[in-house]
C-alpha cells in the first residue's frame, strides 16, 4: 500500500482537528475514571470463576497496572484492590449498577470511534448490548487465556534446554506489545458500525501500539527524572499521574483509530469517490 504522504498527512491533520482528539480523549478519561473500578471488578470476577486462570490473573494484573499507571502501578493496584474488595460486599442491585457503569464506558468508546467514520447509523439496542457484553466478558477471557497458554508453552521442558530458556524469556517480553496490538486491531475492526478493512485496522493498531509502548517509556522516564509532582501533591500524587497517563493513552488509541478511518477516506479519494 503506497501512500502519497503529503495528501495522507494533510487528511490526517484535517481529521485530527475536525474530531478534536484531545477533547475526545478528555471525555473518555472522565468516563474511564468513573468506570475503572467497576470494570476491574467485572474483569477479575470473571477470572475467579475460572480456576484455570488463577496463575494468569496475577500476570494480567501486572500487565494492566504497569500499562494503566506506569511508575505508580503498585499504589493504584493497592487502591483498586481495596475498592474491588469492598464491592464484593454489595448486593445484587449495586453489582448490576457497577456492570452498567462499565458498559457505559464501552458505549462511550463506541460512539467516539464511530464519529471518526462519520457513521450516523445506530445499532439496535440488542446488538449494542450484545457487542458491549462480548467486549466486557469475552475480551478478559481471551487475554487471560493467551497469557496462560503462552506461560504454559514457555514453561515446557523444550524451552529449558539447549539455550532456549533465554529465547522463551525474550519472546515473553513481547507478549504485552502483541496483546496491545491485537486489542487495538480488534477495536478498530469491530467497533465501528461499518465495514473496516482489516489491513487498515492492523496498520492503525501497530502505529498506536508503538506510540503507546514508547509513550509509556517516555512517561516513566519523565516521572522518574522530574518528580516535582510528588512535592506538590504528596500522597495524592498518584491521582494526577493516573489521569495524565489515561488521557495520553486515549489520545494514542484515538490516533490509531483516526489513521484507520483516514486510510479508508484516502483510498476512496484515490478511486475518485471523494473530494478533499
Swiss-Prot record:
It comes from the Bacteria. GO terms for cellular component: plasma membrane. Pfam families: Virul_fac_BrkB. InterPro entries: UPF0761_bac (IPR023679), Virul_fac_BrkB (IPR017039). The chain crosses the membrane at residues 33-53, 90-110, 125-145, 147-167, 171-191, 203-223, 239-259. Keywords: Cell inner membrane, Cell membrane, Membrane, Transmembrane, Transmembrane helix. It is a multi-pass membrane protein. The keyword Nucleotide-binding does not apply. It is found in: Cell inner membrane. Its main location: membrane. Belongs to the UPF0761 family. NCBIfam families: PRK01637.1 (NF002457), yihY_not_rbn (TIGR00765). HAMAP family: UPF0761. This is UPF0761 membrane protein APL_1950. It comes from Actinobacillus pleuropneumoniae serotype 5b (strain L20).
Amino acid at each position: 500500500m503506497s501512500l502519497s504522504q503529503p495528501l495522507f498527512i494533510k487528511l490526517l491533520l484535517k481529521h485530527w482537528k475536525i474530531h478534536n482528539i484531545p477533547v475526545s480523549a478528555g471525555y473518555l478519561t472522565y468516563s474511564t475514571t468513573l468506570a475503572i473500578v467497576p470494570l476491574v471488578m467485572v474483569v477479575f470476577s470473571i477470572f475467579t470463576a475460572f480456576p484455570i486462570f488463577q496463575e494468569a490473573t496475577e500476570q494480567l494484573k501486572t500487565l494492566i497496572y504497569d500499562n494503566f499507571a506506569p511508575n505508580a502501578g503498585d499504589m493504584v493496584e493497592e487502591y483498586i484492590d481495596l475498592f474491588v474488595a469492598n464491592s464484593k460486599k454489595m448486593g445484587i442491585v449495586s453489582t448490576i449498577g457497577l456492570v452498567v457503569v462499565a458498559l457505559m464506558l464501552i458505549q462511550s468508546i463506541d460512539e467516539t470511534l464511530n464519529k471518526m467514520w462519520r457513521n450516523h447509523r445506530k445499532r439496535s439496542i440488542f446488538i449494542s448490548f450484545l457487542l458491549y457484553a462480548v467486549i466486557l466478558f469475552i475480551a478478559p477471557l481471551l487475554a487471560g487465556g493467551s497469557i496462560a497458554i503462552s506461560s504454559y508453552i514457555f514453561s515446557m521442558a523444550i524451552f529449558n534446554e539447549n539455550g532456549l530458556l533465554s529465547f522463551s524469556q525474550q519472546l515473553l517480553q513481547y507478549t504485552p506489545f502483541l496483546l496491545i496490538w491485537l486489542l487495538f486491531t480488534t477495536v478498530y475492526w469491530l467497533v465501528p458500525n461499518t465495514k473496516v478493512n482489516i489491513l487498515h485496522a492492523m496498520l492503525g493498531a501497530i502505529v498506536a501500539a508503538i506510540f503507546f509502548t514508547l509513550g509509556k517509556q517516555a512517561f516513566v522516564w519523565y516521572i522518574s527524572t522530574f518528580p516535582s509532582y510528588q512535592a506538590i501533591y504528596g500522597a495524592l500524587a498518584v491521582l494526577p499521574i493516573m489521569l495524565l497517563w489515561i488521557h495520553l493513552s486515549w489520545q494514542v488509541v484515538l490516533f490509531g483509530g483516526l489513521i484507520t478511518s483516514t486510510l479508508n477516506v484516502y483510498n476512496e479519494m484515490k478511486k475518485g469517490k471523494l473530494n478533499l
